[in-house]
């Protein structure tokens, strides 16, 4: 039986910290689905389609991974895809309490689905999509913190970023 994990997030944009979790997750599971969860409460920099394309390009050389989007209950998606694991990355202990609550709710909704937490690599500990977007908007460069495809797309969105190269 294939071990299928789903790694959900907004990925707006995907960062090298996310890629670290994906690459490590691929060593644990037969298939990893990077799931862009649609969140109407958040205003997004990139459309869902743009995010799918950037993630696919960033992971083009990886086998066993695919990218999808979903607007619904996560456990329903995992079950529909034949998965049994939700993969989550943690940067700090402060994130654990919230993630733990989500994991317990998902477990209550479907007892056959487990949540696996991976600590982000120390190199990416401080990296978040929100911080990267804010720094870029103000002229800072995210080079080295995001895949090259994301860097190029962010240059289009944030003209100030181009001045600081």
Curated annotation (Swiss-Prot):
Class of enzymatic activity (EC top level): transferase
Matching SUPFAM superfamilies: Nucleotidylyl transferase
Subcellular location: Cytoplasm
Catalytic activity, EC: 2.7.7.3
GO CC terms in record: cytoplasm
Site (Transition state stabilizer): 18
Gene Ontology molecular-function annotations: ATP binding; pantetheine-phosphate adenylyltransferase activity
InterPro entries named in the record: Cyt_trans-like, PPAT, Rossmann-like_a/b/a_fold
Catalyzed reactions per annotation: (R)-4'-phosphopantetheine + ATP + H(+) = 3'-dephospho-CoA + diphosphate
Annotated binding of substrate, by residue: 10, 42, 74, 88
Signal peptide stretch: none
Cofactor needs: Mg(2+)
Binding site for ATP: 10-11, 18, 89-91, 99, 124-130
Keywords in alphabetical order: ATP-binding, Coenzyme A biosynthesis, Cytoplasm, Magnesium, Nucleotide-binding, Nucleotidyltransferase, Transferase
Function of the molecule: Reversibly transfers an adenylyl group from ATP to 4'-phosphopantetheine, yielding dephospho-CoA (dPCoA) and pyrophosphate.
NCBIfam families: coaD_prev_kdtB, cyt_tran_rel
Protein family membership: Belongs to the bacterial CoaD family.
Protein name: Phosphopantetheine adenylyltransferase
């Amino acid at each position: 039986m294939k071990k299928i994990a789903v790694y959900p997030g907004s990925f707006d944009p995907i960062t090298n910290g996310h890629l670290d979790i994906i690459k490590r997750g691929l060593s644990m599971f037969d298939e990893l689905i990077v799931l862009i969860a649609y969140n109407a409460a958040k205003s997004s920099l990139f459309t869902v389609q743009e995010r799918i394309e950037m993630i696919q390009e960033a992971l083009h050389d990886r086998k066993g991974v695919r990218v999808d989007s979903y607007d619904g209950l996560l456990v329903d998606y995992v079950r529909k895809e034949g998965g049994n694991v939700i993969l989550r990355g943690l940067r700090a202990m402060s994130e654990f309490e919230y993630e733990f609550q989500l994991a317990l709710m998902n477990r209550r909704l479907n007892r056959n689905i487990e949540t696996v937490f991976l600590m982000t690599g120390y190199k990416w500990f401080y990296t978040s999509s929100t911080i990267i977007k804010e720094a870029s908007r103000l002229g800072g460069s995210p080079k080295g913190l995001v895949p090259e495809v994301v860097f190029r797309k962010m240059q289009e969105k944030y003209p100030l970023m181009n001045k600081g190269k």
